[in-house]
Each structure stands twice: as C-alpha cells, then as structure tokens.
From Swiss-Prot:
Database matches in Pfam families: AAA, AAA_2
Organism listed in the record: Myxococcus xanthus (strain DK1622)
Oligomeric and partner information: A double ring-shaped homohexamer of HslV is capped on each side by a ring-shaped HslU homohexamer. The assembly of the HslU/HslV complex is dependent on binding of ATP.
Gene: hslU
Translocase among keywords: no
Name the record gives this protein: ATP-dependent protease ATPase subunit HslU
C-alpha cells in the first residue's frame, strides 16, 4: 500500500492532469485513508469502510484520467467499467458482478507480473542453461507435456553435459549477442484449445468454475509444439517458461484476491446514463431497467461476496469511484440508497482556454511532446511557438463552444488536422526543422474556424 501523503498525491497527479484540484484532493484523501486504516487496531479496522466518490463534470475534463493515475500511484488493481453496458438480472447482457471478476483478473495480472519480475534473474539463468544444453545437442522439453492415456512417458533423451568452462563461454556469447543469428529448435506448450476458450465464459465464472483448470490434467489436452526460432526468441520463450515454474500460482492467487479486496479501485463511468429522470418514481419503459441496474450495483457497493473462479471475493473495502456528465439527469435522480453509498461528491469544472494551453504544454505526456517524439523518428524536429499553442487552444475552445463540448479530447482531432500534411510527408522530407507558428495554425484550420456547420462534423 502506498504511503504517499495527500499533498504528494496531488503533486503527482499535477504532472499529468491540469486543474481539477477539488477532485484531486478528494481522491488523495481517499488513498491516504486506506493507508491510515492499515495502521488502526484489528478490532476497529474491519469497521472502517472507504468513502466512495462520485465525480460530476462534462466529458474530457479528466475524470477517468484521475482515477487511472491514482491506481497506478497506489499500485492497486484497477478496472474501468461503463454503467450503461450493464443490464439487470433477467435481461440479456453483462451483469454487474462481472466488474468484480474483472478486478480480480487485473489483480492476478498485477501480482503475477510482480512475482515474475522478482524471479527474473533466476529465470534468465535457468533459460540460458537450457539453451546451452540445447545447442550442445540436448533436448528442451516443456514440463507441461502429458503422454497419451495408457502409455508411459518416454525416457528423457540423453543430454550431453557441458563443462563449466564451456558453459560460461556460451553464456558470455549469449549475453554479448554473437549468437543472435543462430537458429535453434525448441518445444513450447500450446495455449488452451479454441473450443475450451469458448466455454470459459461468464456463466461458468458465476459459479466459480474454470473449465481450463478442470481439463488441464486430461490426457491429450496439454500439447507441445516444436518451433525453430532464433536464439533471442528462444531465450525469451524459455525465460517465460522457467519464470512460470518459479512463480507459485497459489500464492499469486491468494495475494491477488487479498489485494483486490483491500486495495481494489473500480471506476464506474457513465453512471448518469442509468439515472432515472423521475428519480425512480416513474412508470415503465427503459427506466425500469435503469433502476434495476442501480439496485444490482447497490449490494456490491455496500459490501457483498462474489463468486469468481479464484474463490469468493468480498467487496466491503473496495473503493468505488463513479463519474458522469449529468447533462440530462442529475445525481439526485439516482435511487436514494445508491446516493448514500457515494458520500463524497466532487464537481469538475469545464476547461477554459487557459486550461487548454496548459494541457498542451505542462503534462509529462502532453500531446505536443507526443507528436514531437513521433516525428523525430523520421528525422523531423518539430517545434511549436508560443503563439501557435495559444491559437490551437483558442480554436479548440471555439469548437467546443459552437458544437458539443468534449473538453481536452478536442485537442486530439485539432492536432491531427493541423499535422496531417507533415505526418504524411515526414518520411520523404528527410532530417529538417519544422516550426509551427500561429499563421500556419490559422492556415491549416481555417475551414474549421470559418465554417461552423463543417465543424459540427469534427470530433
């Protein structure tokens, strides 16, 4: 669990997100409260539940990015879902419990990656040893191969032992890259059959059954495939296989489930789309289904147990962050019980022209830095003058005001239109400097500025 102070969290979020200080403070406090909870005595710890957050603001102002960056900062399992994709029980579609299963899968991947990184040096050494034996005439067999039913496993082929001096010589050549062009033949385990993947869907996860685990010991299901590859790829395949042997899957599963339960973050986007305009008091129509989804979400947010293929998962201490534009509906249109489960309400401000200028300049991964890095691969040294950046922000703001306000996402299509010509011709231009000024911006984007009807077709 991250021990960042709220001020440090806000400072870190400032590197990627412009403005929205109220939302940053809210998520920073929520993250710190998780750390504080871990320091509390055991008898009180289970009684402290996270305070869920609902973000209200137009699209493109940073709601999703704040939640995503927070999860990375906390090194916590994170999943983003859209409330409008869910249907209530009895209707065709995704059920709300799938968000918990997705979170556990994200936690499994996160913990497995951490454990694989820990055993990386040892796996590298073992992979090199196997590759050296292979190149000296030995065999490399996959440990997951299963003999046909009724037959004893074949005896292992004789392996020509390599002396320590020869082994170190080969190892030095491997690491120096002098053997990169050599081809070797290795056996690798095949992935699960296609028909098995077709049966491992949502229905089986609901009852906590993983068919691939059930059938993994059936004779003939685990097959290997012989491949002829170059040494670097062979080393990568063997490294992956050795790392899988060194990582304890049971430990990964236990740690992942615990981390999902205690540190998991679920971002529920478009929650305004399931808000009934009558506040749940209306009659039939689609509002019935909307309210049904809300009532299905309610026990998960309150705290319940969900069956997954990795076991039972409790949702009592997961942090839920909901977000919505609420252009048509309003937060009070959600059912009262669900409103009460999101006690922290934060309103995000629409982006101004000054905000768009800062978004182009300040973030660590700003769009201008991205385009500059992309074109530098072709030898084109792209640069933007200050007046060009200001003009870009002004045009984006004007387009947002005259058509739909999509916030910072407008900058993506504005820049694509601006740099269309240089992106197309960069490979033919050769190494050169290319400066974008305000005059060039107005020239390239004149049609968007002058024709308001045309701008309605531009995202």
């Amino acid at each position: 669990m991250s021990a960042f102070t709220p001020r440090e969290v806000v400072s870190e979020l400032d590197r990627y997100i412009v403005g929205q200080n109220a939302a940053k403070r809210a998520v920073a406090i929520a993250l710190r409260n998780r750390w504080r909870r871990q320091q509390v005595d055991d008898d009180l710890r289970d009684e402290i539940h996270p305070k869920n957050i609902i973000m209200i603001g137009p699209t493109g102002v940073g709601k999703t990015e704040i939640a995503r960056r927070l999860a990375k900062l906390a090194q916590a399992p994170f999943v983003k879902v859209e409330a409008s994709k869910f249907t209530e029980v009895g209707y065709v579609g995704r059920d709300v419990e799938s968000m918990i299963r997705d979170l556990v899968e994200a936690a499994i991947a996160l913990v497995r990656e951490e454990e694989t990184e820990k055993v990386g040096p040892r796996a590298e050494e073992l992979a090199e040893d196997r590759l050296i034996e292979l190149m000296q005439g030995g065999g490399v067999k996959s440990s997951s191969a299963t003999p046909p039913f009724g037959f004893a496993p074949p005896p292992p082929p004789p392996v020509q032992r390599v002396s320590d001096s020869a082994r170190e010589k080969f190892r030095a050549q491997l690491r120096a890259g002098t053997l990169d062009d050599v081809e070797v033949e290795v056996e690798t385990a095949e992935s699960s059959p296609t028909f098995m993947r077709g049966f491992s869907g949502q229905g089986m996860e609901e009852i906590g059954v993983n068919l691939q685990d059930l059938f993994k010991n059936v004779p003939g299901m685990n097959k290997t495939r012989r491949r002829r590859v170059r040494v670097p790829e062979a080393l990568q395949l063997l490294r992956k296989e050795e790392a899988a042997k060194l990582v304890d899957p049971d430990r990964v599963q236990r740690e992942a489930v615990a981390r999902a339960e205690m540190n998991g973050i679920i971002f529920i986007d478009e929650i305004d789309k399931i808000a009934s305009r009558e506040g749940g008091k209306g009659g039939g129509g689609p509002d019935v289904s909307r309210e049904g989804v809300q009532r299905d979400i309610l026990p998960i947010v309150e705290g319940s147990t969900i069956n997954t293929k990795y076991g039972v998962v409790k949702t009592d201490h997961m942090l839920f962050i909901a977000a919505g534009a609420f252009h048509v509906s309003k937060p009070s249109d959600l059912i009262p019980e669900l409103q009460g489960r999101f006690p922290i309400r934060v309103e995000l401000e629409p982006l101004t022209g000054e905000d768009l200028v800062r978004i182009l300049r300040e973030p660590k991964n700003s769009l201008l830095r991205q385009y500059t890095a992309l074109l530098s691969t072709e030898g084109v040294r792209l640069s933007f003058t200050d007046d060009a950046v200001t003009e870009l922000a002004r045009i984006a703001q004007q387009a947002n005001e005259s058509t739909a306000n999509i916030g910072a996402r407008r900058l993506h299509t504005i820049l694509e239109r601006l740099l269309d010509e240089v992106s197309f011709s960069a490979s033919e231009m050769g190494p050169r400097d290319f400066q974008v000024d305000a005059a060039y911006v107005r020239e390239r984007l004149a049609a968007i500025v002058q024709d308001e009807d045309l701008s309605r077709y531009i995202l």
